A protein has these predicted regions:
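Bacterial N-terminal signal peptides that target proteins for export
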Residues: 18-32
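Short beta-strand edge/turn micro-motifs at domain boundaries
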Residues: 150-177
Length: 178
């Protein structure tokens, strides 16, 4: 701890003196060491399984979005997004905020099945940032009668009570091929 000494200089003050620390018996020290190792081993073995489960759950959300899109179900597609005013969607040099705003944009831009085409996600990479947040990136492509728009996306997902949901979507389209 730092405090001013009698001369007004900043000085380090010891919080504990050696007399304040009580000795630990060898048996208790072994028990503490063994228990600590067991807890770390349990945590280490659970982490890969939790990571795999989270990645599988996120892949399922994106697959459900793709399936809903390919049925012409924009509302079903939107189930992958957090129903929140803070949900963000960035594309076409525009930032849209709020679940309803994002849904309305999809409904306007893809007002019929021919405009929707068939959606395919590929090159999916998912990285957990914590136990309740992840980033996913990949490619998207729409197969339509007259064109095949495609591009890249980066998503930030959060684990909410209803499951993993997209809270931030940055999608870009490649220039059309001549």
């Amino acid at each position: 701890m730092l405090e001013l000494d009698a001369a007004g200089h900043l000085a380090y003050k010891r919080l504990l003196s050696p007399q304040m620390i009580s000795p630990v018996s060898p048996a208790r020290a072994r028990w503490i060491a063994i228990t600590s190792c067991m807890l770390m081993a349990i945590r280490a073995s659970a982490a890969p399984e939790q990571t795999a489960n989270a990645i599988t759950e996120i892949r399922s959300v994106l697959q459900a979005q793709q399936d809903a899109w390919n049925r012409g179900d924009i509302d079903g597609f939107m189930n992958g997004y957090a129903r929140s005013a803070s949900t963000v969607f960035i594309s076409e040099d525009t930032v849209r905020r709020g679940w309803e705003t994002v849904r309305d944009r999809y409904r306007e831009k893809y007002s019929n099945r021919s405009k929707m085409g068939t959606l395919a996600f590929s090159d999916l990479e998912i990285t957990l940032l914590s136990s309740d947040s992840a980033v996913a990136s990949g490619s998207w492509k729409l197969n339509r009668a007259n064109d095949q728009p495609h591009g890249q996306f980066t998503l930030i997902l959060k684990r909410l009570p209803e499951g993993w949901r997209i809270v931030h979507d940055h999608t870009s389209a490649a220039p059309p091929t001549p």
